[in-house]
From Swiss-Prot:
Belongs to the bacterial ribosomal protein bL32 family. GO terms for molecular function: structural constituent of ribosome. This is Large ribosomal subunit protein bL32. The gene is rpmF. The keyword Ribosomal protein applies. Coiled coil: none annotated. Signal peptide: none annotated. GO terms for biological process: translation. PANTHER family: 50S RIBOSOMAL PROTEIN L32, LARGE RIBOSOMAL SUBUNIT PROTEIN BL32. GO terms for cellular component: large ribosomal subunit. The keyword Ribosomal protein applies. InterPro entries: Ribosomal_bL32, Ribosomal_bL32_bact, Ribosomal_zn-bd.
């Protein structure tokens, strides 16, 4: 079984890990409801692309 000849330094390890990051979610302003919501999803008030397609979620 292969074994590393040298220990990986902190700098080398951190340079490799620079691409391991979480992308911020895409948020858009919905002019119909006046709220911010995620793209391609129904808003909490039941609107999608400016049209009402579902009942609003109730706060139980």
């Amino acid at each position: 079984m292969a074994v590393p000849a040298r220990r990986t330094s902190k700098a080398k390890k951190n340079k490799r890990r620079t691409h391991y990051k979480v992308a911020a979610p895409t948020v858009k302003f919905d002019e119909t409801t006046g709220d911010y919501s995620r793209s391609h999803r129904v808003s909490l008030k039941g609107y999608y692309k400016g049209r009402k397609i579902a009942k609003a979620a109730s706060a139980e």
